[in-house]
Amino acid sequence: ILNSRFSKEYDAIKDYFDSLDVSTIDAINTHYLEDFFFTITGKTKHEKPNDFETMKTWFCSHAGISLGEIEKVDQLYCICFQGKQGTGKTSLFRYLTPNVLKDYTKENLTDYENKDTKISLGENFLILLDELGESSKHDLIKLKSLITQKAVKERRPHAKRDTVLMRRAGFVGTFDKEQVFDDSAGNRRFIVIEIQKVEWSKLKEIPIDEIWKEAKFFYMNGAYNKSIDGMNTENNSKYEKTNPALEAIDNLYFTLDKNGNEFYTATEIQSHIEKEMRIRLNTKSIGEAMNKMGFEKVSKAIDGISLKRYKITAKVTKSEIAESKK
């Protein structure tokens, strides 16, 4: 009977969001999302405008997904609660789930590529990604791919053929480390909210239904920021792991100067850093670091040989760099 034509489709997630009455809400009197933000961060939306806007975007986007309108949602994100152990990050995940949807959550997700994980995208309201700080770089790459999926095609248990499942789940991550991400380029999918100390007595006074009702209202009226990649990249920079190439270039050797009059290839820079710092770096990491720091790369002929070179002002002389290549 499970897969017969007599089985009636029941969508608990959509039914819940359809039942949220937003007819009495107006933009002036909304405050539940702001109250939630203040209760978990200790800051107002005016004190941390970027953090509030990115958090609001996650709630509104997930309201759209829950209404079955994922194709209208431009970008998909994972909201992450960052804070010391014991601040209640995992409990916040459970708070975000309305009582009628308690059976539609998944915790302890570890394998980002197996069949059950992909099916869970179409069957759950929220998925917890606990302790992201312990994830490897390879795992985070797989996770970013999972976060961006809008639909999956898999064969459910007892089914005879594959089924296309539209994404329903939202991702909630937690971590306590301050260095989690390997690079800024792929971090825009993560919305990090720093948790100081959750005031649970006050949070209990904020009905989760009212928060999701506001999120639905803002989503339906397009009253949220749909382009937060830049804000995410800026916000998440402090959670990036130490980059040896960035440190060597930024702190020890070269300063950004738009009027720089010296030109060096990534290989020349590599040779000098390795000699002076006694660390081995590849030209790819050096190139990425130079580009991230804004150094201009131009075609420049030296001694009759035209190569792509970085325009810089060096804190060491040309002869010192030339000597390091010997």
Descriptions of predicted regions:
Residues 226-326:
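DNA transaction DNA-binding modules
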